[in-house]
């Protein structure tokens, strides 16, 4: 990696918006660190010479910190973080499962906070960089079977 290359960390990169964003940035020549729980998909994506796999479960705060430290050690710097991790479990009101609902909150809300917490000190000390948080339409309006 050269010093002039832009560098990005993307979570939720194994599918959906995160995967599409990772592929787009890699195509444009960015060095892309990708994270998600599904290591086998990340490793397949890392066949692209601009993509590097860093498996991660965003629910684990320490894992978020350690993964970011590993990325910084290897990339030397990060210009942009895009946090796309999310999960969706559509249920009718009679099928709601508290344990699953807590898991959705852990990933979609607390997982993002864990990632922001992992990078905030780095960006403050560097006096630069950007964080983007991506969610789906599910956060703005109701969808069928999403009580």
Across the structure, where does each feature detected by a protein language model lie?
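Active-site loop immediately N-terminal to the catalytic Tyr-X3-Lys motif
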Residues: 94, 141-147
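Residue(s) in the substrate-gating loop at a strand-loop-helix junction
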Residues: 136
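Conserved NAD(P)H cofactor-binding loop of Rossmann-fold oxidoreductase domains
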Residues: 84-89
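Substrate-binding pocket helix/loop in short-chain dehydrogenase/reductase
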Residues: 92-93, 97-105
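Conserved glycine-rich cofactor-binding loop
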Residues: 14-15
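Conserved glycine-rich Rossmann-like NAD(P)H-binding loop of the short-chain dehydrogenase/reductase
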Residues: 28-45
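Rossmann-fold cofactor-recognition segment
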Residues: 48-62
């Amino acid at each position: 990696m050269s010093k002039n290359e832009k560098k990005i960390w993307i979570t939720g990169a194994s599918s959906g918006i995160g995967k599409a964003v990772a592929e787009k940035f890699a195509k444009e020549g960015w060095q892309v660190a990708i994270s998600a729980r599904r290591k086998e998909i990340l490793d397949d994506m890392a066949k692209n010479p601009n993509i590097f796999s860093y498996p991660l479960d965003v629910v684990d705060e320490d894992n978020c910190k350690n993964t970011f430290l590993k990325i910084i050690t290897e990339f030397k710097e990060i210009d942009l973080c895009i946090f796309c991790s999310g999960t969706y479990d559509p249920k009718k009101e009679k099928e709601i499962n508290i344990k699953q609902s807590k898991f959705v909150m852990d990933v979609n809300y607390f997982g993002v906070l864990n990632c922001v917490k992992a990078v905030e000190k780095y960006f403050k000390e560097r006096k630069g960089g950007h964080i983007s948080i991506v969610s789906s339409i599910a956060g703005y309006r109701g969808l069928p079977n999403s009580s």
